[in-house]
């Protein structure tokens, strides 16, 4: 099973690297980089595993005795363990660069088992290091590299936590071909379904939900809009669910009451027990090319694809405003529910 893994360099990234001899061979030289420990603790709580990958030039030679290295190295590991941080594996290359060995970073021989058996999730794993060789290693592993020094540990934390809340999803049937991209932390908005009013409503989800949203839909509109609206809902719901991953840390619940001359409300729970309560009446049969009866069907399909319990209701005079109010209320509730506000799962059962 592939895991979310951080491949972490040691000297100059996790702990300070002495500029005098580039060796940490005494306890006096052992100092942690700022915010390294609290960042790793937080990332651990979001399900990341840690692997140390380090080049130690000449380790075991008279210029760098192994026993001297191990004194500081073991102390470092003891400190990390006392804080709740342990490495799943530790890989150290002891060779000089001119020895042209197979294991020295950025080569990947030390990580061959992880590559061969696909033990890491390429989309959700990272290399963290302070040298160009670390960035080349990231490329060789097919993951993203984050360069410490250019980024602080807190900035690295933000980069990682934001990037894994994105997803892409494609749904292709005989009636439709739909592509969806979602970034729950914001981003580009581009929506083209062939139904202008529906595009306008979907834009409300992106803008008022604070999410990046790209949707393209090619559907059988020559028949009617039913398949396009339904399948967009299914694809969007599946994509949001995929972007949330294990849901650790999310608020889980959302509630919103935007008001104009109409009153629209939405209550949402990411409980994985899909259900829709929908209370809305429209005087018109269509808004633009969108049938008003398809609005309920959209939210029904969306709630089941997302795995949420969803309560929507609206009252007012203007049908356009009522429809827009429903989508805005949903967007605001979604923004609240997916916000990361802790490091735990919002469930006494331990699962959502």
UniProtKB/Swiss-Prot annotation:
Residues 1-164 are annotated as: Histidinol-phosphatase. One of its GO terms (cellular component) is cytoplasm. One of its GO terms (molecular function) is histidinol-phosphatase activity. Residues 165-352 are annotated as: Imidazoleglycerol-phosphate dehydratase. CDD domains: HAD_HisB-N (cd07503), IGPD (cd07914). Its cofactor is Mg(2+); Zn(2+). Its EC number is 3.1.3.15, 4.2.1.19. PANTHER family: IMIDAZOLEGLYCEROL-PHOSPHATE DEHYDRATASE (PTHR23133:SF2), IMIDAZOLEGLYCEROL-PHOSPHATE DEHYDRATASE HIS7 (PTHR23133). In the N-terminal section; belongs to the histidinol-phosphatase family. In the C-terminal section; belongs to the imidazoleglycerol-phosphate dehydratase family. This is Histidine biosynthesis bifunctional protein HisB. It comes from Campylobacter jejuni subsp. jejuni serotype O:6 (strain 81116 / NCTC 11828).
């Amino acid at each position: 099973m592939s895991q979310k893994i951080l491949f972490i360099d040691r000297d100059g990234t996790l702990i300070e690297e002495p500029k005098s001899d580039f060796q940490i061979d005494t306890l006096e030289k052992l100092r942690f980089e700022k915010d390294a420990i609290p960042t790793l603790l937080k990332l651990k709580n979001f399900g990341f595993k840690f692997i140390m990958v380090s080049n130690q030039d000449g380790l075991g030679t008279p210029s760098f005795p192994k026993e001297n290295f191990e004194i500081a190295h073991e102390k470092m590991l003891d400190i990390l363990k006392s804080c709740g941080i342990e490495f799943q594996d530790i890989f150290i290359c002891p060779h000089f660069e001119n020895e042209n060995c197979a294991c020295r970073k950025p080569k990947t021989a030390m990580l061959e088992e992880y590559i061969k058996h696909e033990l890491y999730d390429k989309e959700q794993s990272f290399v963290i290091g302070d040298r160009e060789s670390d960035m080349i290693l990231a490329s060789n592993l097919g993951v993203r590299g984050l360069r410490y020094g250019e980024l602080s540990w807190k900035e690295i934390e933000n980069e990682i936590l934001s990037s894994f809340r994105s997803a892409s999803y494609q749904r292709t049937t005989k009636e439709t071909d739909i592509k969806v991209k979602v970034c729950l932390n914001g981003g580009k908005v581009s929506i083209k379904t062939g139904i202008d009013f529906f595009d306008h409503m979907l834009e409300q989800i992106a803008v008022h939900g604070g999410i990046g949203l790209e949707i393209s839909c090619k559907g059988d509109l020559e028949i009617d809009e039913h398949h396009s609206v339904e399948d967009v809902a299914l694809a969007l719901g599946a994509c949001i669910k995929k972007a949330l991953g294990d849901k650790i840390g999310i608020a889980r619940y959302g509630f919103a009451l935007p008001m104009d001359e109409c009153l629209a409300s939405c209550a949402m729970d990411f409980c994985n027990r899909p259900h829709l309560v929908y209370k809305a009446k429209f005087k018109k049969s269509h808004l633009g090319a969108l049938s008003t009866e398809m609005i309920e069907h959209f939210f029904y399909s969306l709630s089941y694809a997302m795995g949420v319990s969803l309560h929507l209701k609206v009252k007012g005079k203007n049908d356009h405003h009522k429809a827009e109010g429903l989508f805005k209320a949903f967007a605001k509730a979604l923004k609240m529910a997916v916000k990361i506000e802790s490091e735990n799962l919002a469930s006494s059962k331990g699962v959502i």
